[in-house]
């Protein structure tokens, strides 16, 4: 009987101890504390993994604020840590953000291939954003981090991120099928401009290499031993609704999800000591916590507190991250 089963551990300890994981996504509705949770998870992982990378794919780039340190599109070591790195990417940048070295070649024609690829990719709806992720994935895989944590944008962007390997596989497949038709035209065009012949094979080899990496990533994303998703929510109707939608979409995409963080909870020790608003909020949260318990009885549900002060800076995150590993218990108030 299901009722006789022990409830799952209410923490993220299961993820930290699963050393086969390569990709961990953290996402949910805007304003629920995803960045604090993803940063805290990365800190805990850094205790047991050789090297950890946290990537922000949210255009707001809150991990710079969370760690109180400026990050860029290049992995940078987080202050106070030896093996934790962070980077921020713009998911809307597409190929414009790719490094120039990627397009370097022996002839001048190859150097114009960036513009050619951009035009070809623009003809395939939805692939521009996906290609940005694709190149990041290629770079990240080459760096051999033990585990990568994604601090994702609000739900809509997140679902596109999850789907990007399939989008890129389809798009690159189309590009490669088109190459034999397009290459002769390009060769004529560049010869008219007095440039050297365009080496179409060199260009298509780059696409082939990227497709190989993306196919590999796509397989890993659908492997629960290597990829999982952590949903972050608060105990309110709209957040719970968004979480259920996200869980269903992830399941449809074949992405593993078995951890939910409920953030910003009130832990009232004595209802007589609380103000009427706190008592009211506490009752509302209790109602939605009961619904979460019913909906996600086969999930690890981690409950995190609403704090008096914001969580900012490496030491503050390090301290808060302990709440991911063992259930939060409010400190007893000193007697007056």
UniProtKB/Swiss-Prot annotation:
GO biological process: what's one of them? Answer: tail-anchored membrane protein insertion into ER membrane
Which GO terms of the molecular function aspect are on file? ATP binding; ATP hydrolysis activity; metal ion binding
Predominant location of this chain?
A: cytoplasm
Provide the alphabetized UniProt keywords: ATP-binding, Cytoplasm, Endoplasmic reticulum, Hydrolase, Metal-binding, Nucleotide-binding, Transport, Zinc
EC primary class? hydrolase
Q: How does it assemble?
A: Homodimer.
Q: Which family does it belong to?
A: Belongs to the arsA ATPase family.
What role does it play? ATPase required for the post-translational delivery of tail-anchored (TA) proteins to the endoplasmic reticulum. Recognizes and selectively binds the transmembrane domain of TA proteins in the cytosol. This complex then targets to the endoplasmic reticulum by membrane-bound receptors, where the tail-anchored protein is released for insertion. This process is regulated by ATP binding and hydrolysis. ATP binding drives the homodimer towards the closed dimer state, facilitating recognition of newly synthesized TA membrane proteins. ATP hydrolysis is required for insertion.
Question: What protein name is recorded for this chain?
Answer: ATPase ASNA1 homolog
């Amino acid at each position: 009987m299901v009722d006789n089963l022990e409830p799952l551990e209410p923490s993220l300890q299961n993820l930290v101890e699963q050393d086969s994981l390569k990709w961990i996504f953290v996402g949910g509705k805007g304003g629920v504390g995803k960045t604090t949770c993803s940063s805290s998870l990365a800190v805990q992982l850094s205790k047991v993994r050789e090297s950890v990378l946290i990537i922000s794919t949210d255009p707001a780039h809150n991990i710079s604020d969370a760690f109180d340190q400026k990050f860029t599109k290049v992995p940078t070591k987080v202050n106070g840590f030896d093996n934790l790195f962070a980077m921020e990417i713009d998911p809307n940048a597409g190929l414009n953000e790719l490094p120039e070295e990627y397009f370097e070649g022996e002839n001048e024609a190859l150097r114009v291939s960036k513009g050619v690829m951009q035009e070809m990719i623009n003809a395939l709806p939805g692939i521009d954003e996906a290609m940005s992720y694709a190149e990041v994935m290629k770079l990240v895989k080459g760096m051999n981090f033990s585990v990568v944590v994604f601090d994702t944008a609000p739900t809509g962007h997140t679902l596109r991120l999850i789907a990007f390997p399939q989008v890129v596989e389809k798009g690159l497949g189309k590009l490669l099928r088109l190459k034999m038709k397009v290459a002769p035209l390009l060769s004529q065009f560049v010869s008219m401009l007095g440039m050297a012949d365009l080496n179409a094979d060199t260009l298509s080899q780059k696409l082939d290499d990227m497709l190989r990496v993306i196919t590999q990533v796509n397989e890993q994303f659908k492997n629960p031993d290597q990829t999982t998703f952590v949903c972050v929510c608060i105990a309110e109707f709209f957040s719970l609704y968004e979480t259920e939608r996200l869980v269903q979409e992830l399941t449809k995409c074949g992405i593993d999800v078995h951890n939910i963080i409920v953030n910003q909870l009130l832990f009232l020790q004595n209802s007589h000591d609380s103000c009427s608003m706190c008592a009211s909020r506490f009752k509302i949260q209790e109602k939605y916590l009961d619904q979460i318990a019913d909906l996600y009885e086969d999930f690890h549900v981690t409950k995190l507190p609403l704090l008096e002060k914001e969580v900012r800076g490496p030491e503050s995150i390090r301290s808060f991250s302990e709440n991911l590993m063992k259930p939060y218990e409010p400190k007893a108030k000193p007697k007056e």
